[in-house]
Amino acid sequence: WNLELLEMMACGKHVIATNYSAHTEFCNADNANLIEIEAKEVAYDGIWFHGQTGKWAAMKENQLDQLISHMRSIHKLKQDNLLKLNYSAIQTSHQFSWKNTAEMVIKYV
């Protein structure tokens, strides 16, 4: 779900995320710097995921280039004193406030 990403958005930070998986429920081109995923690979990290089930986004050279580009763009804005709050991200995060979440739960319970 990537709650940490949503928390950063609530703080108005400029976030970088893949355009893949659960966080696409709240991340889009208006509120995040997205990395386009072209392929998936077997989920294996040698600790928790051992390749038996599931796939995750493959980070190949093109995705690393996108990540570097997004990082450079954000850093350049900061260096030039042009980095502002990400108001689109803040607005998005309000949809997932505790108040709104509680109201949705009450509505369906």
Positions of the model-derived regions?
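Classical protein tyrosine phosphatase
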Residues: 17-21, 25
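Methionine-biased hydrophobic packing positions in alpha-helices, especially
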Residues: 8-9, 71
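Short glycine/serine-rich donor-binding loops of glycosyltransferases
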Residues: 2-5, 20
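Short amphipathic alpha-helical segments and helix-helix/interface helices
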Residues: 5-6, 24, 93, 106
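Short hydrophobic faces within alpha-helices
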Residues: 7-8, 16
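Short hydrophobic beta-strand element within catalytic cores of glycosyltransferases
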Residues: 14-17, 33-34
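A charged, aromatic-enriched C-terminal amphipathic alpha-helix characteristic of glycosyltransferases
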Residues: 58-69, 76-107
